[in-house]
Structures are given as C-alpha cells and as structure tokens.
Amino acid sequence: MSNTIKMVVGLGNPGKEYEQTRHNAGFWFLDELAWKWKASFKEEKKFFGEVARAALPDGDVWLLKPATFMNRSGQAVAALAQFYKIKPEEILVVHDELDIPCGRIKFKLGGGNGGHNGLKDIQAKLGTADYYRLRLGIGHPGDRNLVVGYVLNKPSTEHRRQIDDAVAKSLQAIPDILAGKWEEATRFLHSK
C-alpha cells in the first residue's frame, strides 16, 4: 500500500532572523521530521525552496521548506507538486495557527485560510483548498493590530516548550496520516 500523503510542506520564512519566530513553526516541524526519517534538505532553485526526499517503505515522501517567504509559499508547493504529479489531496501543509491556543494541534482537510498568507497563496496556486493541514497552535496576542509583530517574534520559553511538545506529538501521528487513517490521527492530535 502506498502512502496517501506524498508531500509534506512546512511553512516559514527563510533567513536567520526568522528562524526562531512563531511563524516558522512549520519549519521546526519539518526539521524534526527530516531528522526522524534521516532525510537531508538541499536547496532546489527550480522548486523555490529546500527539498528532501524520504525513502520510506511505502514509497517516497517529499519534504519542502519554501524559500519564497510566507506570502509566496504556493509558488514552491505548486512547482514541486506539478513536477512529481502530486495531487492537492496528497499534500500535508504544516503551519502556525493564531486561532488555536499555544501547544494545541488541529488536523483537517480543506477549509478556509484563516487569514494565513501562506495558505492563501497555496490555495491560489493549486486552485483548490483541498489539501491537508496540520495546524500548530501559537496562540493569539489578543489584538489583531499586534498580530504581525507577534508572529514575527520569538515565543517565550514556556510557549516554545509548548510548541515543541506539539511538534513531538504531531510526529507521533505521521504514520497514521501517511496511511490515510484520518480519524485515528485526528482523535490523537485533538486530544489533550
């Protein structure tokens, strides 16, 4: 049986100055997944980002960290998906989520973009919202005028620990997600 997910995308912004910011939670997840799968990233200009191929027993899974900055993430996702003939429903996008308490996780297929510029661009470039999302809660600053500064700053030590715990828990659900066991993955990820 082959994997139902053929590409995992972590969203973030490239560059040292953004490395530890909340908006890069998707990159944090992907770095841990690549380490777990012993896959190495290398820059691929034709895919507008860093790409790693994980050779798994049930087939290859491509890992992608767009180097386009958040609001142009779709350019990288669409380039890799088109080249390897990966359908939107075979893509998992991992990203930070303001509307979920810090350290909580939500998993879903499709839906709105919640104002997330990375998701907006992916939807525009793929022509559909029907791809899977793993949403890592980073919490909300409480005032929409503070959002940009909030996502582009480092979390507190406590919040970073909560996000790291959410990443670790999410990694445990990846085998079910790859196997298409959506209900099992959702139940596990949504539990406290």
From Swiss-Prot:
It is found in: Cytoplasm. The record marks 96 as: Stabilizes the basic form of H active site to accept a proton. One of its GO terms (molecular function) is peptidyl-tRNA hydrolase activity. One of its GO terms (cellular component) is cytoplasm. InterPro entries: Pept_tRNA_hydro, Pept_tRNA_hydro_CS, Pept_tRNA_hydro_sf. The record marks 13 as: Discriminates between blocked and unblocked aminoacyl-tRNA. It catalyses: an N-acyl-L-alpha-aminoacyl-tRNA + H2O = an N-acyl-L-amino acid + a tRNA + H(+). TRNA binds at residues 18, 69, 71, 117. It holds the Pfam family Pept_tRNA_hydro. GO terms for biological process: protein quality control for misfolded or incompletely synthesized proteins; rescue of stalled ribosome. Gene3D superfamilies: Peptidyl-tRNA hydrolase. The keyword Zinc does not apply. The active site is at residue 23. Keywords: Cytoplasm, Hydrolase, RNA-binding, tRNA-binding. Its EC number is 3.1.1.29. Monomer. NCBIfam families: pth. Hydrolyzes ribosome-free peptidyl-tRNAs (with 1 or more amino acids incorporated), which drop off the ribosome during protein synthesis, or as a result of ribosome stalling. Belongs to the PTH family. This is Peptidyl-tRNA hydrolase. The lineage of its organism: Bacteria, Pseudomonadati, Pseudomonadota, Betaproteobacteria, Neisseriales.
